[in-house]
Amino acid sequence: MVKVLAVLYDGGEHAKQVPGLLGTTENELGLRKWLEDQGHTLVTTSDKDREGSTFDRELEDAEIIITTPFHPGYLTAERLARAKKLKLAVTAGIGSDHVDLDAANKTNGGITVAEVTGSNVVSVAEHVVMTILVLVRNFVPAHEQIEAGRWDVAEVAKDEYDLEGKVVGTVGVGRIGERVLRRLKGFDCKELLYYDYQPLSPEKEKEIGCRRVENLEEMLAQCDVVTINCPLHESTRGLFNKDLISKMKRGSWLVNTARGAIVVKEDVAEALRTGHLRGYGGDVWFPQPAPADHVLRTAKNPFGGGNAMVPHMSGTSLDAQKRYAEGVKRILDSYLSGRFDYRPEDLIVHQGKYATRAYGQREDVKIPGQ
């Protein structure tokens, strides 16, 4: 019998109304009956942050843990050291930066860390394009004006622009970044740029109509819109700080659906306040859930707009939840059956080694100036 611990977010009445909210503590990724029919135990909780949390208590004798980027149970080196039986850590979604991967490689002979690669890349890419449009078209202040019973076209049109003719750049052109560029192609942007250590093929660049810029600061200086689509690792943590933001065009927009810790939140808020950034939007925060006084909840530009922040939802649409729930079950089945036939693309660390280059495990994956 195997004990499985799942750290998920609470759905409350919403999970009852919509059973498709699979990523909640109530609906448990649809796993309970399947696991219990095999004689295994499933413990589900959202309690993860306080001292002596259910997460901490139940982790000590769990063999498998399931976490999610949308309500991350941070698997620190200290927590892993107490998890004497842990063999498999599964991310329900994509992005395993909430796990100390170096420590996972050294714990219990090497804990396998896996995620459901590709499960929500379309979902996030769509959210990026939506956020770009929401910011550029100044949608949020306009909608708030209508809700307040007011009507002042000039007030909102003074900070509204077209996406056509703008230069858009992505930091990272992996599965999400590439899909963002493809979706932007139809907006007749002046130019689509990308910064990544790994270039796209010439054929893809021609098909999408994009161009690689090898220096990050050089790309930022050209862009009206910048979207962050790279993983969080030590070279990208705090990357968008006061210094790097100062290299961006004054009045540009920044979108972040990657990870909250890639930006320095106070520096983003100050750039908004001064108008150096016209807008900032996305759905990722650090920590998560975001505290009520998190500066990016209320940061605004000089016109009182420019904020398109939402809870961490871009990758957890109902369609995405179905895909990553199925993926988690597939990974669990590979382990519980003893086949260990994981999809190679799902593996982050395995058998004490890194199985991917996505988390900065290369000498050439270094951000200039870092």
UniProtKB/Swiss-Prot annotation:
EC number: 1.17.1.9
GO BP terms in the entry: formate catabolic process
Classification lineage: Eukaryota, Fungi, Dikarya, Ascomycota, Pezizomycotina
Record field: catalytic activity: formate + NAD(+) = CO2 + NADH
Subunit structure, as described in the record: Homodimer.
Name of the gene encoding the protein in the UniProt record: FDH
Binding site for substrate: 94, 120
Purpose: Catalyzes the NAD(+)-dependent oxidation of formate to carbon dioxide. Formate oxidation is the final step in the methanol oxidation pathway in methylotrophic microorganisms. Has a role in the detoxification of exogenous formate in non-methylotrophic organisms.
UniProt temperature dependence: Thermostable up to 55 degrees Celsius.
Protein name: Formate dehydrogenase
HAMAP family listed in its UniProt record: Formate_dehydrogenase
